[in-house]
Amino acid sequence: MTVLTAAEPPNRIEVDMDAPSLDTDSSCTSLSSSVQRYEYKHGRRYHGYHAGSYPFPNDKREQDRLDMIHHVYTRILNDRLFLAPLDPRGKAILDIGTGTGIWALHMGDAHPAARLIVGNDLSPIQPSWAPANVRFVVDDVEKDWVDRHPYDFIHCRYMAGSIKDWPRLIRQCYAHLRPGGWLELQESVNVMYSEDGTLPPDSFMARMMHGLIVACEKSGRTMDPAPSMEKWVQEAGFDPITKHRFKIPVGSWPKDPRLKECGSLMRVNFVEGVEAFTASLFTEVLGWTPEEVAVLNTGVREEAMRNDIHAIFDFVVIVAQKPY
């Protein structure tokens, strides 16, 4: 078993002392009716196909947030869509939980010589237009896969809180890869921290993340798969395995321009996305009242706008090959 650890990120993210805090006011073509049916609750739209499998909304506001997160993750990877040592030409590629389809669409644009790029998701929210080598499928990846064709590359990103049985999913990835094919898992470690003590453990942001982890565990889904991904791919038989770790700040406080850009977008993610995170899980699973959730959401938004709080997520990428 060959496990490689890529270069770690810098020890500390340097703070831009001149960065101001901000005020919260400033900133398939044929689908069955069951797939197209949606649920509406908490003032938001949720998927109806296998309802409850994904605890977050799928409406336009959420789609915009997901596209923003795609940009953050791509920038953190130095404008790369993937880290696997793969030449996409002539290859069949699968994007698990494609969401809006933005990763698959960008792959199709960037690699027109790729033979096929498939994006699957529970929600049919992908655009009807796409590059010629891209197609979208509505499917539940936790069930037996309908598509029996082998892939050369499987990409799975930002699926925290969505999967009940990660080891089974990874075994299915292994089974549907050609020998020599690659699996890439990208997830943030959903425990926030600061390197300078500016994020207290009882902060609203830390409490929200802890609540999400507890609620997902009660629902039978893990909100923090990143720490276990390396073990799961080892157990599935992948070899070699490379682990990359990056830092994602929340806020515009970093000096580094790229991290400042990513942090500014992550601030928007919290300010505008906190309602999507908490609406269903905190009321339906944790039993909070709407008033209690509203207080938490307000606290999260206010903390996210402060540049004297230097919150960070770690971002983990696992690149694993199926042996020949």
UniProtKB/Swiss-Prot annotation:
Purpose: Methyltransferase; part of the gene cluster that mediates the biosynthesis of pyranterreones, a family of antioxidative compounds. The first step of pyranonigrins biosynthesis is performed by the hybrid PKS-NRPS synthetase pytA that condenses 4 malonyl-CoA units ato the acetyl starter unit by the modular PKS of pytA. The acyl chain is then connected to an L-serine through the amide bond by the modular NRPS of pytA. A tetramic acid is formed and released from the PKS-NRPS pytA to give pyranterreone 5 with the help of the thioesterase pytI.
Keyword annotations: Methyltransferase, S-adenosyl-L-methionine, Transferase
Pfam families: Methyltransf_23 (PF13489)
Up-regulation conditions: Expression is positively regulated by the cluster-specific transcription factor pytR.
Protein name listed in UniProt: Methyltransferase pytC
Molecular-function annotations in GO: methyltransferase activity
Top-level taxon: Eukaryota
